[in-house]
């Protein structure tokens, strides 16, 4: 069984098609990097998997839960809630609650959504903070943290829900350059644990070295995909080669 399976996904904004019948399959334990120019549909695809965007057509399957976007999503609310409990999402701009401490941010999902005992969720949150290198920051507020620290809290928050898959939407693009490495190292650690992840990123070296598979998108379509190292070393499609040209010359 696939961890994620997307079939014939179509998304439009104001009548303009931004995803043209996308098919995507992600296996359990696979790390997939999605690359491509700005406006190519990468983030829209990622947000559609979690139904943060409502597609016009297509099916989205995570584990054994399938959403048919041709049907009214209001009639599938229970299924969508179930799907979201299986999918962690790490946003570009962290999306932490500013008026809550680090610990409160992490335990909210497990306690409110999943009904876990607060003591159990708190113990797990402390473990996760240690895992992402932020032990001792439990009572800090987001505004007191650097961007890199906030993003690592956001990763811990996603992990706290024990998701089957984690989606990362350009997790380093809002960070100062010197803070990028600490977040990438955290994601690299998760990849080594064989967690199922889909990562939209502009960090080409990271995508090549960490992902099992790379997908190049342009103008709302998947142009090319394959083993990450092979795609970066010798892309088959001229458009992929053009996009990667500067990187390949380094």
UniProtKB/Swiss-Prot annotation:
Quote the record's activity regulation: The TcyJLN system is inhibited by L-cystine, L-cysteine, DL-2,6-diaminopimelic acid and L-cystathionine, and is stimulated by D-cysteine.
Induction profile: Expression is induced by H(2)O(2).
| MF term (GO), any | ATP hydrolysis activity
Subunit architecture: The complex is composed of two ATP-binding proteins (TcyN), two transmembrane proteins (TcyL) and a solute-binding protein (TcyJ).
User: Which compartments is it annotated to reside in?
Assistant: Cell inner membrane
Report the domain of life of the source organism: Bacteria
- Disulfide-bonded cysteine pairs: these are none
Q: What is its EC number?
A: 7.4.2.12
Q: Which gene encodes it?
A: tcyN
Q: What is its main location?
A: membrane
| Function of the molecule | Part of the ABC transporter complex TcyJLN involved in L-cystine import. This high affinity cystine transporter is involved in resistance to oxidative stress by forming a L-cysteine/L-cystine shuttle system with the EamA transporter, which exports L-cysteine as reducing equivalents to the periplasm to prevent the cells from oxidative stress. Exported L-cysteine can reduce the periplasmic hydrogen peroxide to water, and then generated L-cystine is imported back into the cytoplasm via the TcyJLN complex. Functions at low cystine concentrations.
PANTHER family, per database record? AMINO ACID IMPORT ATP-BINDING PROTEIN, L-CYSTINE TRANSPORT SYSTEM ATP-BINDING PROTEIN TCYN
Per the database record, which ranges form the ABC transporter domain? 4-244
What InterPro entries does its record include? AAA+_ATPase, ABC_ATPase_HisP-typ, ABC_transporter-like_ATP-bd, ABC_transporter-like_CS, MetN_ABC_transporter-like, P-loop_NTPase
From the Swiss-Prot or TrEMBL record, give the protein name: L-cystine transport system ATP-binding protein TcyN
Print the keywords alphabetically.
Answer: Amino-acid transport, ATP-binding, Cell inner membrane, Cell membrane, Membrane, Nucleotide-binding, Translocase, Transport
Q: What happens when the gene is disrupted?
A: Disruption of the gene decreases uptake of cystine.
Give the reaction(s) catalysed. L-cystine(out) + ATP + H2O = L-cystine(in) + ADP + phosphate + H(+); D-cystine(out) + ATP + H2O = D-cystine(in) + ADP + phosphate + H(+)
- The residues that hold ATP are 36-43
Q: Which family does it belong to?
A: Belongs to the ABC transporter superfamily.
One GO-annotated biological process of the protein: cysteine transmembrane transport
Q: Which Pfam families match?
A: ABC_tran
Q: Which GO terms describe its cellular component?
A: ATP-binding cassette (ABC) transporter complex, substrate-binding subunit-containing; plasma membrane
């Amino acid at each position: 069984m696939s961890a994620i399976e997307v079939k014939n996904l179509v998304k439009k904004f104001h009548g303009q098609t931004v995803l043209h019948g996308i098919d995507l399959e992600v296996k359990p334990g696979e790390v997939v990097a999605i690359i491509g120019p700005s406006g190519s549909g990468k983030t829209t695809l990622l947000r559609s998997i979690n139904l943060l965007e409502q597609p016009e057509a297509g099916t989205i399957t995570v584990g054994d839960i399938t959403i048919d976007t041709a049907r009214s999503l209001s009639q599938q609310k229970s299924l969508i809630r179930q799907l979201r409990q299986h999918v962690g999402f790490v946003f570009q701009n962290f999306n932490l609650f500013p008026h809550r401490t680090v610990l409160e941010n992490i335990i909210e999902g497990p306690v409110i959504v999943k009904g876990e005992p607060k003591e159990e969720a708190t113990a797990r949150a402390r473990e996760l903070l240690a895992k992402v290198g932020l032990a001792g920051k439990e009572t800090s507020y987001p505004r007191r943290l650097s961007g890199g620290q906030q993003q690592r809290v956001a990763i811990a928050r996603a992990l706290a829900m024990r998701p089957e898959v984690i989606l990362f939407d350009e997790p380093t693009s809002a960070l100062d350059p010197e803070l990028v490495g600490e977040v990438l190292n955290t994601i690299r650690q998760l990849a080594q644990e064989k967690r199922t992840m889909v990562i939209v990123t502009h960090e080409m070296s990271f995508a090549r070295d960490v992902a099992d598979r790379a997908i190049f998108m342009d103008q709302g379509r998947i142009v090319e995909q394959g083993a990450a190292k092979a795609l970066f070393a010798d892309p088959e499609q001229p458009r992929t080669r053009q996009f990667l040209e500067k990187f390949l010359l380094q």
